[in-house]
């Protein structure tokens, strides 16, 4: 019964952003008082608070525009019939970077726990694996969104600013307006936040269920396809 109560408290904490989205970054540990802080606890709180996303988007924006600013893309652009494939190659590189970064973060957090608390408790691996893979996919989709912004705008400062604003829930103002309009036209209890990548990052519970995984993966897949298609099309048509 105590274990069920702990799981229930963690799930309530993980889903608190569904109806109350704050602007800014909020990181709160789900660890129960008197219990050891697990690696999963810290990873969950940072992933939910979009701390990892903030780090990833900085690299994504710089990487997406590096070859354009250096002039390298102009040298090879004329030799490639399908320039959109250059975007696909970037997406593959970003996928590897995101996966390696996530794995490194998890290992680094274990080392940090050892230094800070003098112990390492990983957590429940049945919770860790599905949560880790789902958040990894959502973060990759978010990275591609930021890459698309950088490719379209072609300005590092503006692209970086917009990407950081996304991690800080600035779009919650727009989401609130969309929800209001949706409810006014008869879509009761409509919540656009559930259908966004950043929303799914924040709402994903620690004890993730099959429905959570499927819905989050579907949202991520839709954004991955849209961002890749949009970036490739614009890059193909644009005069470089």
Where are these regions (language model features)?
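Junction motif at the cytosolic side of a transmembrane helix
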Residues: 222-240
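Hydrophobic positions within alpha-helical membrane elements
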Residues: 72, 85, 159-160, 229
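Transmembrane helix boundary and interhelical loop/hinge segments in multi-pass membrane proteins
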Residues: 60-83, 91
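Structural detector for helix-capping/boundary residues
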Residues: 71, 89-90, 233, 238
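Secretory targeting signals
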Residues: 1-63, 87-157, 163-164, 168-175, ...
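Extracellular/periplasmic helix-loop junction at the C-terminal end of a transmembrane helix
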Residues: 175-194
